[in-house]
């Protein structure tokens, strides 16, 4: 069982590494767009913000199965800590969960704040069709 989990983890790490250049390029594009804005009044709200920051949308990514050791537990622990901080500050919280493990844990306490759950339990291979849902 550990060998299977290790092989799947290695495959997932390789996929994540292949996506890193794309992520870095997207980060550069957003930084260039936001730095080129001189007038905050005419800029799109996505880039300039509204200044209110009252509503926070948090996307919690966990697995659908439990073969990840402490991965899911650590993600959920960090998420709950962050949610508690937002609640303490009086912020409104909306949650999207990706993966059934996170949804199962968070719906007990934050069920009314979860606006969507995306799960890939029935898919063997992730592809664009499934990623498009996210």
Predicted regions and their residues:
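Conserved loop-to-helix interface motifs that mediate assembly, gating, or partner/ligand docking
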Residues: 1-134
């Amino acid at each position: 069982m550990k060998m299977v989990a290790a092989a799947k983890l290695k495959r997932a790490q390789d996929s994540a590494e292949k996506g890193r250049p794309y992520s870095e390029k997207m980060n550069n594009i957003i930084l260039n767009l936001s730095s080129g804005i001189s007038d905050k009044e005419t800029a799109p709200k996505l880039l300039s913000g509204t200044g209110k920051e009252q509503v926070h949308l948090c996307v919690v990514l966990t697995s659908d199965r439990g073969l990840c050791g402490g991965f899911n537990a650590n993600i959920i622990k960090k998420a709950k800590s962050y949610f508690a901080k937002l609640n303490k500050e009086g912020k409104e919280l909306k949650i999207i969960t990706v993966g059934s493990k996170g949804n199962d844990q968070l719906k007990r306490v934050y069920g009314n704040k979860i606006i969507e759950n995306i799960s890939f339990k029935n898919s063997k291979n992730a592809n664009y069709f499934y990623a498009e849902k996210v």
